[in-house]
Amino acid sequence: MEASRCRLSPSGDSVFHEEMMKMRQAKLDYQRLLLEKRQRKKRLEPFMVQPNPEARLRRAKPRASDEQTPLVNCHTPHSNVILHGIDGPAAVLKPDEVHAPSVSSSVVEEDAENTVDTASKPGLQERLQKHDISESVNFDEETDGISQSACLERPNSASSQNSTDTGTSGSATAAQPADNLLGDIDDLEDFVYSPAPQGVTVRCRIIRDKRGMDRGLFPTYYMYLEKEENQKIFLLAARKRKKSKTANYLISIDPVDLSREGESYVGKLRSNLMGTKFTVYDRGICPMKGRGLVGAAHTRQELAAISYETNVLGFKGPRKMSVIIPGMTLNHKQIPYQPQNNHDSLLSRWQNRTMENLVELHNKAPVWNSDTQSYVLNFRGRVTQASVKNFQIVHKNDPDYIVMQFGRVADDVFTLDYNYPLCAVQAFGIGLSSFDSKLACE
């Protein structure tokens, strides 16, 4: 009798283990369902930032001047040089050096083959397929019926909006393709740290992957570079660390290896306890942990800081955010910023208003549309769904120059477009900060 009990016990343990796993999976599925319902209900609120519906009906109704902001706007100078300042996004450019895409939309054949260019890392495509990560992302299916021409619409020309020949300059002047101005993407690590070329908008997509047992609570984010002819290149991946008191996202140029010890680790995003302030770091070592053990060359740099305005009184409306980045040199390189303690961090200097060699950006205030009873921004066809995450980043001295814009096009698909002086890691970190929950801002 005792022997039979011993023989049955392993089977009983196995059944019990399977039941526990099923219960855990059912609980996770239920929590994910509740979260999705809450998010869908939240998107229907009038305080979400909506894409301007008049942006696609240009001839139907004239728009106000504040809704006609081009994605890239380099004003036509009276002389042959545009003045440049450290605290502004403008750059020293001659008119013949401004490469502006055409105003007209690109025409893409419906049966064009969707391909993905991956960085030249050995075995990257095989590793993507092995881990069931889609390397050929069909963005046209994920935008819920949005036409390709809307998603691939090019920004306005670099000439001034007040110019009388603006309508003909876009078609008459052959613009150099943006792909030729992005440089060599084979060295992916160098590319994600380099500022965007002046006069070029780097267009990207972020895919949020919730597949797997715990990815509903800790999803993985993949950032792709959009190229001509519907090609995409993988750039960055990030995932929120599980055992961390504050939000902590590790950023990697490898879609599979998202560990801090990996060779592909390029930075991280960390928040405070309330989730209202974030800092983007590179792959360097924390000066407090490596004091006296590492040289200055290996000390980590602060690439950006993001601060969301708290909403302690419960007033609803669009989020208000500020972005602080290091200034740029005359050679258009970012000034290395390596604080040795928290009192000298980007956030601390911004709060103390000691902004020497720093650049402060902020989100563009959306316009209240009385017809739709919602806040709207003109994303020029790049954002198609309402979300509190939709925003545009500008500088106060040049509010028409969109440094970065971010918004939703599907449930788990977002567009991210950035310009000089941001780099890919900075832009990705700013976008990730929008995903994280904020206790005092909702």
Curated annotation (Swiss-Prot):
Expressed at high levels in testis, ovaries, thyroid, and spinal cord. It is linked to Hepatorenocardiac degenerative fibrosis: An autosomal recessive disorder characterized by progressive degenerative liver fibrosis, fibrocystic kidney disease, and hypertrophic cardiomyopathy with atypical fibrotic patterns on histopathology. Disease onset is variable, ranging from childhood to adulthood. InterPro entries: Tubby-like_C, Tubby_C, Tubby_C_CS, Tubby_N. Coiled coil: none annotated. It comes from the Eukaryota. This is Tubby-related protein 3. The lineage of its organism: Eukaryota, Metazoa, Chordata, Craniata, Vertebrata. SUPFAM superfamilies: Tubby C-terminal domain-like. Associates with the IFT complex A (IFT-A). Interacts with SIRT1. It comes from Homo sapiens (Human).
